């Protein structure tokens, strides 16, 4: 008798409710798109469960507005083409015209459940009428604007927003060009909206001076229920109204529910590279005391994330940071700028930030007195760190950084080393060898040093067993942490300047001399997925592999930032920058090439100089060898004429990268240069974005005209894509 065949069961046989929950749990956009291609049933379920959507079409093509995403709660309208142009037509009257009203109505009808909205708001008309379409459901709004502010009275734009969206609890103005004077009046005029706010982001690089004491007092008084507050401040005591003791105490008193607090000086937000030779101390000290910091931290017991990034000395901050351990037990992320005395262990005792044993992320910048032993103290105390950033710390050497990496070998996966005099590319990579099989994200500076330089470094012997670094005497307390260095020799800590033979051969990856080898071998960065590089103008990328990054089998994304004044160079030393060397990374598909901080001559250069078009050719030469799918490119700029435009050589070289599917140019381009890009066979998405301050206002130039961009998009969408 023949056996009855067992029916083959597939995922599609699951009940629709269960299958719908499975698909709803998928968050990655590309994975959801692939899910929708399986069959019609999965397509319907994917569309009905998608909650996040970014629209990229042209606003004039309303017939293409998708109507199947009825469950969208997060809607991003900041990238609609043509980028940066008003979404709703501007009028002198208080009411939108018919076209604008139709656009707003269709968006609300298509996406009825929006609770979070991101919007490019170039004019007040858009701010007033579009968010108001979801007045009863909208909770979070992010406004984006890189163009100049409209000529209105202080606070008028935000007042229009608050009147139309009375239910919002979260407001993000971090990329919205406005004045600090706009915020306090709008909050005072709408006390109910201000009282409802729980998240407020004012970390805006466009503020020339940041918020001052009186403004901070008004904002925090109007918003007592804030749980997340990020703000650009003025800490420089040379300015009237600088942030000092009064403002900090007022903040902690008025907003005791804060779990996320970011206080950053406006000069930090510009992301300009510091001077590696700087000692880390400024002429002026910040005008708030350690006792004030202790009072503030004591009043914010719910803190989970703290950024205190100032540009003036905060001296002897160790005792205040020790308070964080007991007063802010939930603290997991900490960033400090210009704080001194954060880790100065004496007689084997940990102190300062090293006692914050619950930290998962730590970032430090311009700590003038931090040396290798202080860094090792941090590694001993903060043994759970998964992310570590260090910037502008002149006294740190490769030996201290390597010891820290060894101590945190089991947890550390994200590292940034920037602008440290003794940590160039090779020394940084050598220091990170203990975690090279675990690290996933990395930033280094492409300052090409050599191994021979390491051997001449002054230092001490950190002669303790790194295999026991997370245990030993330091783990004697019930929590598994301690306040001492444990197995480290006390004499070593008493004599911080003692010199003796280093404990491992710098030409080997083993630690053998003291019998405490940890077996770090090989040169493969097995899990590295993201790499960020800083490089000075005129320098070459070709030594990257020789520095220690020759084998990165899983590297998918790279960001290269080039900075400097090319007017100081007659020409580069080689014909090409070295992008072709990146072909050794087989999975590299996404690149950010940021030449936006290169300064040069956009037009005719003086005799003996190269204009920016030739520099663009230098940096893009060889890009055709890479199998990139997505590229973000920032052209170099001429600040004298506020021009950041794609040149003819750049357009010609970009068209040779035939694998590209997405190309975003953060600048302007002539229409006929853009037409070169149509020769890329699989290119699906191209956009010009002037997302820098100040964005050009002249919309009549061929680089900016909306009709020019629309003609290119029509030609792009008219092509047949092979897949």
Swiss-Prot record:
This is F-box protein MAX2 homolog B. Pfam families: F-box_5. The gene is MAX2B. GO terms for biological process: SCF-dependent proteasomal ubiquitin-dependent protein catabolic process. Keywords: Cytoplasm, Nucleus, Ubl conjugation pathway. Residues 2-55 form the F-box domain. GO terms for cellular component: cytoplasm; nucleus; SCF ubiquitin ligase complex. CDD domains: F-box_AtTIR1-like. Its main location: nucleus. It is found in: Nucleus; Cytoplasm. Component of SCF(ASK-cullin-F-box) E3 ubiquitin ligase complexes, which may mediate the ubiquitination and subsequent proteasomal degradation of target proteins. Is necessary for responses to strigolactones and may be involved in the ubiquitin-mediated degradation of specific proteins that activate axillary growth. Targets probably SMAX1A to degradation upon the formation of an E3 SCF ubiquitin ligase complex (ASK-cullin-F-box) containing MAX2B and KAI2IA in response to (-)-germacrene D in the stigma. The keyword 4Fe-4S does not apply. Mainly expressed in fully expanded leaves, lateral roots, axillary and shoot apex, and, to a lower extent, in internodes and nodes. It comes from the Eukaryota. Disulfide bonds: none annotated.
